[in-house]
């Protein structure tokens, strides 16, 4: 995902294959290569500082999606925290990482009339804070 991309402060990159189980903050196994690519990027660029952004689709009256694992409306935050916790567990320093959940407030597609559009709204992005 990061091969050949020039990184710049302020840049946001969508982690294309970061898939979670529906209504949960648990990552699906097929997403591990994407997660490992992010880890490899951080290990190769020791000064890289990132912010992890979680997004969900289909929110109605609540600002964030419902997380069945925590019985709370913090799904996007918990998904971003899942990535954060994994990176910390793999030795990336906490000073290089932060995370935020945006719920459904920053949709790529406000019209979520089909599954393709909804799927693109359910995403994890990283923002390059500094190099």
Question: Which functions belong to the PLM regions below?
Answer:
Residues 1-51, 59, 63-64, 129-131:
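Periplasmic peptidoglycan-binding/tethering modules of Gram-negative envelope proteins
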Residues 55-131:
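Periplasmic OmpA-like peptidoglycan-binding domain that tethers envelope proteins to the cell wall
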């Amino acid at each position: 995902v990061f091969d050949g991309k020039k990184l710049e402060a302020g840049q946001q990159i969508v982690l294309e294959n970061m898939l979670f189980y529906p209504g949960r903050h648990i990552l699906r196994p097929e997403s591990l290569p994407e997660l490992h690519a992010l880890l490899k990027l951080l290990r190769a660029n020791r000064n890289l500082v990132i912010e992890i952004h979680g997004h969900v689709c289909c929110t109605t009256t609540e600002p964030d999606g419902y997380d069945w694992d925590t019985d709370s409306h913090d799904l996007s935050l918990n998904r971003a925290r899942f990535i954060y916790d994994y990176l910390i567990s793999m030795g990336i320093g906490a000073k290089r990482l932060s995370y935020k959940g945006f719920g459904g407030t920053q949709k790529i597609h406000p019209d979520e009339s089909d599954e393709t559009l909804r799927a693109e709204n359910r995403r994890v992005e990283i923002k390059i804070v500094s190099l």
